[in-house]
Amino acid sequence: MKLTLEPAPRCLHEYVSQLLEDWQPECLSCEYSHGGSSPPSLHDLFDLELENSRSPSPLLCDWCAEADSESTISTETDVGFTLNTPPVSPLPSYSTSPASIPEDMLLCLEEMPTFDDGDEVRSATTSFEHWENNFDPNVGSFFGCLRCAYYQEQGENSICGLCYLKALAEEPVDADAGEDDEVIFVSAKPGSRKRSAVTSRGSVESSKRPCLPEPEQTEPLDLSLKPRPQ
């Protein structure tokens, strides 16, 4: 076996540069010198011609190129253009006289609203307040509150709304009223309803089978639409 020893290169830098020149591909062949310290740029590696920055790019479509050209034209025409607006005329001053406001409208709202038989809002100087100051409760028979007495003294057999609601609440419920009304009993089981008519005492006594009372409902009603499991 024969071994050959090559002499070591005297200058390592020259040896590496020679190897790079031997193995350099054809696409990278250009006119730049390897002795420069800065690496080559893309413009050195590729042959590109720079066009005017304002000209449209050849890769754009026709519509984009037209829009770009119109925008450049509009910017060129707008340079040095000033908008001349007419001066704004001052608002004319109208001589307004103070509105005639009655003294009743200037009163506090807590003293102002009172209602008469026509349900109209009046001022503090209404006929009701004049009547209230001169009213003698010992003269005449009145029922209800002071407002009801005011209506009754004017010849109206009426009472105010508050006394009317109070009278309705105190009125006893008639037990015989609504005997023939239909009553619907709702059982605890969903979907089952039993209808029965409330009859008089004579018909209950004459019936052969007595009316049994419904069992007391201890289970709450299920108002959902989902059927309950059996």
Swiss-Prot record:
A motif (LXCXE motif, interaction with host RB1) lies at residues 106-110. A motif (Nuclear localization signal) lies at residues 226-230. It is found in: Host nucleus. One of its GO terms (cellular component) is host cell nucleus. Residues 40-48 are annotated as: Interaction with RB1 in competition with E2F1. A zinc finger (unnamed) spans 145-163. A motif (PXDLS motif, CTBP-binding) lies at residues 220-224. Residues 189-230 are annotated as: Disordered. GO terms for biological process: regulation of DNA-templated transcription; symbiont-mediated perturbation of host cell cycle G1/S transition checkpoint; symbiont-mediated suppression of host innate immune response; symbiont-mediated suppression of host JAK-STAT cascade via inhibition of STAT1 activity; symbiont-mediated suppression of host type I interferon-mediated signaling pathway. Its main location: host cell. The keyword Zinc applies. GO terms for molecular function: zinc ion binding. Keywords: Activator, Early protein, G1/S host cell cycle checkpoint dysregulation by virus, Host nucleus, Host-virus interaction, Inhibition of host innate immune response by virus, Inhibition of host interferon signaling pathway by virus, Inhibition of host STAT1 by virus, Interferon antiviral system evasion, Metal-binding, Modulation of host cell cycle by virus, Transcription, Transcription regulation, Viral immunoevasion, Zinc, Zinc-finger. Belongs to the adenoviridae E1A protein family. Plays a role in viral genome replication by driving entry of quiescent cells into the cell cycle. Stimulation of progression from G1 to S phase allows the virus to efficiently use the cellular DNA replicating machinery to achieve viral genome replication. E1A protein has both transforming and trans-activating activities. Induces the disassembly of the E2F1 transcription factor from RB1 by direct competition for the same binding site on RB1, with subsequent transcriptional activation of E2F1-regulated S-phase genes and of the E2 region of the adenoviral genome. Interacts with host UBE2I; this interaction interferes with polySUMOylation. Interacts with host RB1; this interaction induces the aberrant dissociation of RB1-E2F1 complex thereby disrupting the activity of RB1 and activating E2F1-regulated genes. Interacts with host ATF7; the interaction enhances ATF7-mediated viral transactivation activity which requires the zinc binding domains of both proteins. This is Early E1A protein. It comes from Canine adenovirus serotype 1 (strain CLL) (CAdV-1).
